[in-house]
């Protein structure tokens, strides 16, 4: 069960809905400690005086910033006095069309859950009303001493809260591209070919088909080194080629897309599939089909080995039955 990080209520009009706030995502990045090379001794960081090199106690540290060439020191108590007070309400002050908000404004996503069973009815009322009108509620609230601009929106079965950037935090993209969009205009033929490529590559959004391959490689590196095996070296990706003739590059891409749609290599039988080429979702599904026990606790390398072994046994059994 995710940990509740904030408790309060959503207010819109005269309706109040008690809710709890939960993180919608989790970070699977591998965290390393620092050690002195050749030892098992952890390395610790100390706060030291830049001029004297002496260690400084936590209570002797103040925050500060230069203003007009003068260092202004600020005490923690002074910051506490002007900090926004903890809010227990998410007061929706306006509803806007979801499509009117540029995704660049969205920062982080949280789930909002009803405070208790008796609050499900008003909770679902707000969720369904926003879903049917494609509206999101704009509100501000305070969490962990900081004021957030937020958008409360409807998902399939839950309310989501997105923290948002304020307008002055969004950088102007015009500083990067200038008037390139009006000067370097593509021809109608180029647009047509680019559209054909996009259409040939179009598909459904299936997020489970994508995985963090770098984290998986780091896990395998650690496992290999722990077991005394030589780490596998990843091949360097091919160097990107410079686009000399845009029209020719588009034409080749269109031809390649057509060949890809019409002349795909037949897929191997399931029992002969190279498990290393499977995505994590496909690997989990295959393990479930093969009835591999304890799969939920296995690391990818162990799961690959178990699936490969199970596939080999199943394939061998089928061949023996055919031969008989």
From Swiss-Prot:
<feature type="region of interest" description="Disordered">
    <location>
        <begin position="256"/>
        <end position="324"/>
    </location>
</feature>
<keyword id="KW-0238">DNA-binding</keyword>
<keyword id="KW-0234">DNA repair</keyword>
<comment type="function">
    <text>With LigD forms a non-homologous end joining (NHEJ) DNA repair enzyme, which repairs dsDNA breaks with reduced fidelity. Binds linear dsDNA with 5'- and 3'- overhangs but not closed circular dsDNA nor ssDNA. Recruits and stimulates the ligase activity of LigD.</text>
</comment>
<keyword id="KW-0233">DNA recombination</keyword>
<dbReference type="GO" id="GO:0006353">
    <property type="term" value="P:DNA-templated transcription termination"/>
</dbReference>
<dbReference type="InterPro" id="IPR006164">
    <property type="entry name" value="Ku70/Ku80_beta-barrel_dom"/>
</dbReference>
<dbReference type="InterPro" id="IPR016194">
    <property type="entry name" value="SPOC-like_C_dom_sf"/>
</dbReference>
<feature type="compositionally biased region" description="Basic and acidic residues">
    <location>
        <begin position="281"/>
        <end position="292"/>
    </location>
</feature>
<dbReference type="GO" id="GO:0006303">
    <property type="term" value="P:double-strand break repair via nonhomologous end joining"/>
</dbReference>
<comment type="similarity">
    <text>Belongs to the prokaryotic Ku family.</text>
</comment>
<feature type="domain" description="Ku">
    <location>
        <begin position="10"/>
        <end position="193"/>
    </location>
</feature>
<protein>
    <recommendedName>
        <fullName>Non-homologous end joining protein Ku 1</fullName>
    </recommendedName>
</protein>
<dbReference type="GO" id="GO:0003690">
    <property type="term" value="F:double-stranded DNA binding"/>
</dbReference>
<keyword id="KW-0227">DNA damage</keyword>
<dbReference type="InterPro" id="IPR009187">
    <property type="entry name" value="Prok_Ku"/>
</dbReference>
<dbReference type="Pfam" id="PF02735">
    <property type="entry name" value="Ku"/>
</dbReference>
<dbReference type="GO" id="GO:0006310">
    <property type="term" value="P:DNA recombination"/>
</dbReference>
<dbReference type="InterPro" id="IPR011112">
    <property type="entry name" value="Rho-like_N"/>
</dbReference>
<comment type="subunit">
    <text>Homodimer. Interacts with LigD.</text>
</comment>
């Amino acid at each position: 069960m995710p940990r509740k990080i904030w408790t309060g209520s959503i207010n819109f009009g005269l309706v109040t809905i008690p809710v709890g706030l939960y993180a919608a995502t989790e970070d699977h990045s591998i965290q390393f400690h620092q050690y002195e090379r050749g030892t098992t001794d952890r390395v610790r960081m100390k706060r030291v005086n830049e001029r004297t090199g002496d260690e400084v106690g936590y209570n002797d540290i103040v925050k500060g910033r230069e203003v007009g060439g003068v260092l202004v020191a600020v005490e923690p108590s002074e910051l506490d006095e002007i900090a926004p007070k903890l809010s227990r309400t998410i007061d929706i002050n306006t509803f806007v069309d979801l499509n009117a908000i540029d995704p660049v404004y969205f920062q982080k996503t949280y789930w909002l859950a009803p405070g208790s069973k008796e609050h499900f009815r008003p909770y679902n009322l707000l969720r369904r009303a926003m879903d049917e009108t494609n509206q999101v509620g704009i509100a501000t609230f305070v969490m962990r001493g900081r004021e957030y601009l937020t958008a409360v929106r409807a998902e399939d079965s839950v309310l989501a809260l997105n923290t948002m950037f304020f307008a002055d935090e969004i950088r102007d993209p015009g500083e990067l591209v200038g008037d390139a969009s009006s000067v370097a205009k593509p021809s109608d033929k180029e647009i047509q070919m680019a559209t054909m490529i996009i259409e040939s590559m179009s598909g459904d959004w299936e997020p489970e088909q994508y995985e963090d391959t770098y984290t998986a490689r780091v896990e395998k590196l650690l496992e290999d080194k722990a077991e005394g095996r030589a780490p596998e070296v990843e091949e360097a990706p091919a160097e990107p080629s410079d686009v000399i003739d845009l029209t020719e590059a588009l034409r080749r891409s269109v031809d390649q897309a057509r060949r890809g749609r019409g002349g795909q290599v037949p897929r191997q039988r399931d029992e002969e599939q190279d498990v290393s080429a499977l995505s994590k979702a496909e690997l989990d599904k295959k393990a479930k089909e093969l009835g591999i026990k304890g799969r939920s606790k296995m690391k990818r390398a162990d799961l690959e080995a178990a699936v490969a072994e199970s596939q080999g046994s199943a394939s061998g059994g089928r061949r023996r039955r055919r031969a008989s």
